[in-house]
Amino acid sequence: QAPPPVLIASVNTLRALVQEVPEMVEALAEKFWPGALTIVLPAQQSLVWDLGETHGTVAVRMPANRYALELLQETGPLAVSSANLTGQPAAVTVEQAHDMLGERVAVYLDDGPSVMGLASTIIDATGLVGPEDERRPVRVLRDGAISRAELRTVLGDLLEREPDTAPKPAP
C-alpha cells in the first residue's frame, strides 16, 4: 500500500513540507492546483510524521473541493487516505466510501458525488531536485484525471517518455 498523500491549502505549505520546490513544480502547481495532481518530492528533514515507507519523500496535493480547502486552512496539512481500498475503484459518493471502508473511517465529509470519478494523477518529481546536471525526468506513478499530454504542456521533455514510445536499444 502506498503512503498517504498530504493535502495542503497553499503552495506556501508545500514549501514547508519539502526540501525544494523546483521551478517546474511551481508551474505545475499554478496550472493544475487546486486539482487532481499529486506531486512526490523529497521531504524536509524536519518532517517527522509517520507516513509509512516513503524513502524520504512526501506526496502532496491541493484538493479542488472548497470545503476541504477551508478545513486545511484551519488545520494545516492533513495526511489522508483515498476513498477506496488498494486495487479497488475510487468511491464516487460518500455512500460508496462508507460501504467500502465502514467504521475504519472516523469522519466522512459529504459534498455530493465526485465530479471527476477519477483518481488523481501521481507524479514523482524528485528528479528535479538537486544540481541541474543530475536532474532526471518526472515519472508518472499513476495515470489519473490529468493526462500525460496535459503534463507535457508544462514539463515538455522533462516528462518521462510513455513506456510504449521509449526508444528501443539497438540489437
Task: Describe the role of every protein-language-model region.
Residues 1-171:
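Active-site-adjacent structural elements in enzyme catalytic cores
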